[in-house]
């Protein structure tokens, strides 16, 4: 890997928009939640633009879009969590070459972490559904630690636990939260172009590399 001399000492992966396309299931649950408080359905494309900063923020954005009182946030958020848990992997898919990359890192002895802003209750079921759980020594949700991305805390939690120098560590993600967390932690960063980037030109986030396919990291 050209970003490092040899293999990195640690690789941290984002989940939604990086390893999996989860929007079909997220948007379905969000629409159920919105309807439960008398709001209109948002639909998949709108939900795609809101994903990435955790479920509470997602619900807040949806309520604001629909013109519904923020006073309904607690009940709407609870309805979303319930609906999403019931169909967390129903229509979610892996992006191409995810398993090939994970296998390559594992074969070469690279520790891996899964760091997402998604509530931790959803992380294990999704990883187990796709048979990916055993690849990750850390599985951190947005509520696992006191801070979540774009804070560097989750990244440094992992690197410090194995005494890995930050400059020898890599964050792979798709969004501004991933880029900012990596920069604050002094990790190298790779952003994927196919994820949930909220219309931001990824090069403006100053990642080390932007790729269109995870297979590019195997070249």
Where are these regions (language model features)?
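Helix N-cap/coil-helix junction residues
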Residues: 39, 65-68, 132, 164
């Amino acid at each position: 890997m050209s970003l490092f001399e040899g293999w990195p000492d640690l690789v941290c992966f984002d989940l939604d928009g990086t390893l999996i396309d989860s929007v079909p299931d997220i948007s379905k649950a969000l629409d159920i939640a919105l309807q439960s408080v008398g709001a209109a359905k948002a639909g998949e494309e709108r939900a795609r633009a809101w994903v990435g900063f955790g479920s509470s923020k997602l619900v807040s954005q949806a309520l604001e879009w629909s013109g519904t009182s923020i006073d309904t946030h607690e009940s709407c958020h609870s309805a979303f969590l319930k609906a999403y848990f019931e169909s967390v992997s129903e229509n979610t898919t892996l992006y191409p070459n995810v398993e090939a990359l994970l296998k390559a890192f594992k074969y070469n002895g690279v520790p891996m972490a899964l760091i997402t802003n998604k509530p931790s209750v959803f992380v294990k079921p999704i990883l187990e559904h796709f048979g990916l759980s055993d690849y990750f020594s850390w599985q951190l949700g947005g509520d696992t630690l006191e801070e979540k991305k774009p804070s560097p805390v989750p990244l440094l939690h992992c690197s410090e636990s194995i005494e890995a120098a930050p400059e020898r560590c890599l964050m792979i993600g798709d969004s501004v939260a991933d880029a900012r967390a990596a920069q604050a932690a002094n990790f190298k960063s790779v952003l994927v172009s196919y994820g949930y980037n909220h219309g931001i030109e990824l090069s403006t986030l100053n990642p080390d590399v932007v790729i269109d396919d995870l297979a590019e990291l195997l070249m």
